[in-house]
Amino acid sequence: NSKFWTLNYPTTALIPMAKLVKIIKQKNFQNVTIPALFYFSLNDKVVDPQKTINFISQWGGKSKTINVKMTEYDDKYSHIVAGDIISPKQTEKAFSEITYWIKDINKK
């Protein structure tokens, strides 16, 4: 398994993310009509949850917000909210919530 994943990332991986954040800050999302699922932890220590909440409030399309309640067995930074390696106790619930959301938006 370890052949296909890592817990260590080079700092150069942050450059594209920083560029994306800069671009997004300059955009207006109030006219967006695409539905969105916002699935995150209010205890995220990597991304300021209040900034996520502020972004959600500007989303023009229909949206659903799910605040993930992390456990002691999950990502200690409450940032990676699903996945068998970092947040194994969240994966099944995340799969169920996302699947339900997709089915729900397809009904309409």
Give, region by region, the residue ranges found by the protein language model.
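Active-site nucleophile elbow and catalytic-triad environment of alpha/beta-hydrolase enzymes
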Residues: 11-29, 34
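Generic structural signal for well-ordered, non-membrane alpha-helical segments
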Residues: 6, 10, 48, 87, ...
